[in-house]
Each structure stands twice: as C-alpha cells, then as structure tokens.
C-alpha cells in the first residue's frame, strides 16, 4: 500500500512540476559545453524582457572596440534529424539564425574577417543536450528540444512544446578572453502531438526575438 501511495504522490508531483514550474532559463544540465565556463552566469532579462543567463566582464568598455569578427553560428553538437525534426528544417533554422544574428550584430560594430587589436570575436551555437526521460517528460536529442506536455497526457493529447537553445560569447581579440557570455532558451509554437512534424515557422519567432535582443542590448544594464 505504501508503495502504491508513494507512486501516486510522485506522479502527482511530476504533473504539478510540468504544468506550472517549467523553467524559462536554461538549466545547468542543458549546458552543452560550447562555452568554457558557465559558473559566472547570472539570471537576468533581455532587452525585450525575455529571461536569459548572462555574464559581462565588470571592466568591459565597448568604446575600446571598433569591430567584430563574425564566426558563423553552428549546431553544437551536430544534430541527428528525425521524423519530427527533419534535415531541411534544421538547415533552415540554422541559415535563418545566421542571417538575422549577423545583421543584428553588424548594427553594433562593423564586421571584419580579420581581428585587429581593438576587435571583438563573436562565436555562437544552437545547442541541444536534452536527454532526460524522467517522469512525464520526453526529450528529442536534437537542437530543438521537444517536450511532451504531461498535463495533457490524461486526455490522450500530447501537445509538444518546441524550444531553441542558444549559447554565445564575445571574446577580446587582444586577450583571447570572453567579455560577454549569453545562454538562453526560447519557446516556439506548440505542435499538436508527437506525430506532428516541426516546421520552421514553429521556431521562427524565437530567432527573431534573439536578433532583436542582440540589437537592443544595453551593456550598461549588466
């Protein structure tokens, strides 16, 4: 009896956790390893009010820099396409992210191909490390994490959340040390169920929001 009661309580806790306590920021177990250090990241909000993890070197002075070396955004690690998230969608997500983010960053400083003494180096990645199958959660091992909404399991409906994870940093070209780091996740449009293929449009707004935040970021609001 105790075992049965405990199982019921555990299941209830799992449902409550999924229905009301889903984190809006990237949790440590989702860090991809793309950045060398995550320990100094602090929770804050982006220019458009989105929750993010960010670190800015206290001595950072943007007036000391005159250009940014753009390194194309990549997938880290390289994803395996699935029946739900196909290669064409993955390619479109990556290409669009590069286009929008490059344009946004170019509004901050001129982009160059070779670093000078006053250059910043940008590097970024769409990351995906969701492998948890605990409780009522299910994660696809692809950069766009698909999470089963456990609160709808009782009805036979499994609406799928879509999430895009991103990690990026700006590095001082002279010291080769990071001066700004950002880790964030964004929620796209839901899929009807686990059999519904994801379309680029499901995640487009997440990318648009990232680009807007990159354009509007105020370094004085650290």
UniProtKB/Swiss-Prot annotation:
Disulfide bonds: none annotated. It is a lipid-anchor. PROSITE patterns: PROKAR_LIPOPROTEIN. One of its GO terms (cellular component) is plasma membrane. InterPro entries: DUF3313. Residues 1-20 form the signal peptide. Keywords: Cell membrane, Lipoprotein, Membrane, Palmitate, Signal. A lipid is attached at residue 21 (S-diacylglycerol cysteine). A lipid is attached at residue 21 (N-palmitoyl cysteine). It is found in: Cell membrane. This is Uncharacterized lipoprotein YdcL.
């Amino acid at each position: 009896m105790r075992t049965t009661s405990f199982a019921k309580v555990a299941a209830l806790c799992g449902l409550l956790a999924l229905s009301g306590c889903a984190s809006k920021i990237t949790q440590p177990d989702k860090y991809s390893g793309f950045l060398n250090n995550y320990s100094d990241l602090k929770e804050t909000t982006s220019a458009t009010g989105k929750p993010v993890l960010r670190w800015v070197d206290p001595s950072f002075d943007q007036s000391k820099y005159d250009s940014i070396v753009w390194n194309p955004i990549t997938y880290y690690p390289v994803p395996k396409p699935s029946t739900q998230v196909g290669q064409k969608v993955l390619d479109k997500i990556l290409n669009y992210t590069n286009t929008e983010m490059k344009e946004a960053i170019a509004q901050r400083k001129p982009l160059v191909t070779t670093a000078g003494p006053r250059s910043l180096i940008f590097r970024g990645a769409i990351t995906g490390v969701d492998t948890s199958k605990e409780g009522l959660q299910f994660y696809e091992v692809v950069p766009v994490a698909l999470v089963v909404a456990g609160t709808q399991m009782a009805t036979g409906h499994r609406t799928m959340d879509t999430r895009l994870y991103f990690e990026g940093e700006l590095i001082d070209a002279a010291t080769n040390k990071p001066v700004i780091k950002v880790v964030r996740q964004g929620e796209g449009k839901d899929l009807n169920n686990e059999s519904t293929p994801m379309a680029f449009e499901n995640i487009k707004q997440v990318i648009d929001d990232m680009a807007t935040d990159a354009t509007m970021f105020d370094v004085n609001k650290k």
